Design a protein with these regions (language model features):
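Pre-active-site segment of Zn-dependent metallo-hydrolases
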Residues: 19, 24-35, 95-114
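Active-site neighborhood of phospho(di)ester-bond hydrolases with catalytic His/Asp-centered motifs
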Residues: 15-17, 41-47, 63-69, 95-97, ...
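Glycine/small-residue-rich loop that forms an oxyanion/phosphate-binding "nest" at active or ligand-binding sites
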Residues: 64, 69-70, 75-95, 100-112
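Short, conserved loop/helix-junction motifs that constitute active-site signature segments
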Residues: 57-60, 88, 110-114, 133-136
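Residue-level detector of beta-strand structural context in well-folded domains
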Residues: 83-84, 127, 159
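Binuclear metal-dependent phosphoesterase catalytic core
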Residues: 2-10, 16, 88-89, 111-115, ...
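Active-site environment of divalent metal-dependent phosphoester hydrolases
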Residues: 20-25, 48-53, 70-76, 100-106, ...
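N-terminal active-site segment of His-dependent metallophosphoesterases
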Residues: 1-63, 71-82, 90, 154-157, ...
Length: 177
């Protein structure tokens, strides 16, 4: 398919998760806004907690979100399913909040999303970047951590994912607090 406004060849994607508003997100943090200005799309991997977070993010770029274990009907009503599968710049991206325990995670996500090239997840608040050890597979799973609830991590984080011509061009974890 040739590139169009809906299916460009290259996308800059901001990736966030576990914002846990209003406890940890009192409003769009300026550092988060700085990092997300200019992205083409935002992916939120759940635990939004209040839909106003999504409204703030949507003022910067279109948002796709999945439900987290702390999200209720109001976040679901914003349009958040439990899982989501998208094609972005020719890359098949799946989203889920909880990808389960570290042990066997890539295999589990491959079974759950057999057609995905990338799975974005959250829940642990721990940044993660892992690629299948199977050379014939290539599934990559990514967790941006949390920009606002770092837990035992040294910094709050989000991710920049650049997708181009059916491949991941880059993944960068950005410290925002």
């Amino acid at each position: 398919m040739p590139p169009t406004a809906r299916h460009p060849r290259r996308l800059r994607v901001g990736v966030v998760s576990d914002t846990h508003a209003p406890r940890f997100w009192k409003g769009l943090p300026e550092r988060v806004a700085e990092e997300l200005r200019g992205v083409d799309l935002v992916l939120h991997a759940g635990d939004v907690c209040v839909p106003s977070v999504l409204d703030e993010l949507a003022a910067l770029a279109p948002v796709h979100v999945v439900l987290g274990n702390n999200d209720g009907a109001d976040v679901a009503a914003w349009g958040a399913p439990e899982t989501l599968e998208l094609e972005l710049a020719g890359v098949r991206v799946a989203m889920i909040h909880d990808a389960g325990a570290k042990q066997g995670r890539v295999r589990r996500m491959r079974r759950r999303f057999p057609d995905a090239d990338v799975v974005v997840f959250g829940h642990s608040h721990i940044p993660w970047d892992e690629t299948s050890e199977d050379p014939d597979d290539g599934l990559r799973i990514l967790n941006p951590g949390s920009p606002t609830d770092k837990r035992r991590q040294p910094h709050g984080t989000l991710g920049h994912l650049v997708l181009a011509d059916g491949r991941v061009e880059s993944w960068t974890l950005v410290e925002v607090s």
